[in-house]
């Protein structure tokens, strides 16, 4: 097992095979932050849709971003982004990051999060776990491809279909 701590940090690099958590709970109930950008500018958003798995021989994360989300422009402009996971004490911070736009306010400051940069990509010191992700593929959800048509009606009344991003998890950081 690989474990190397980052200098000046409580975060250690872990082998992804050593992870032991339920992704359905971690993403769907506890939520995650999708963050992209660098020191010159970044943004973050809360997400409760996503997935983890293996594709093309790589450990991957899948995330979904609607076109109107400010974070999307940062994800689109960069090759990498981070997914970060938090304990219950940070639920309010994730609520702020999910309900306010970085276009209109400094929601990172308002949420009490402290940015740092790993491999040139923004993440937050308060996270218990961070995945550094390198984009491999993206596509738009298309209405004509719904087999279960009720999902189109239920989740897309405004027809603001998500972009799907599949990204290789290149680094896993875990709070020690």
Stretch-by-stretch model annotation:
Residues 14-47, 51-176:
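Active-site-proximal mixed secondary-structure blocks
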């Amino acid at each position: 097992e690989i474990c190397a701590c980052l200098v000046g940090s409580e975060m250690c690099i872990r082998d992804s095979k050593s992870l032991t958590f339920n992704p359905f709970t971690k993403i769907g109930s506890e939520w995650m932050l999708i963050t992209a950008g660098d020191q010159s500018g970044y943004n973050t958003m809360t997400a409760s849709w996503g997935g983890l798995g293996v594709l093309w021989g790589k450990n991957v994360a899948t995330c979904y971003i609607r076109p109107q989300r400010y974070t999307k422009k940062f994800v689109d402009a960069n090759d990498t982004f981070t997914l970060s996971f938090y304990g219950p004490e940070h639920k309010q911070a994730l609520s702020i990051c999910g309900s306010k736009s970085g276009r209109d306010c400094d929601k990172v400051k308002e949420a009490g999060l402290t940015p740092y940069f790993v491999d040139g990509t923004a993440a937050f010191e308060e996270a218990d776990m961070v995945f550094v992700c390198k984009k491999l593929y993206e596509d738009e959800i298309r209405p004509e491809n719904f087999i279960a048509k009720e999902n189109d009606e239920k989740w897309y009344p405004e027809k603001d279909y998500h972009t799907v991003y599949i990204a290789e998890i290149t680094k896993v950081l875990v709070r020690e």
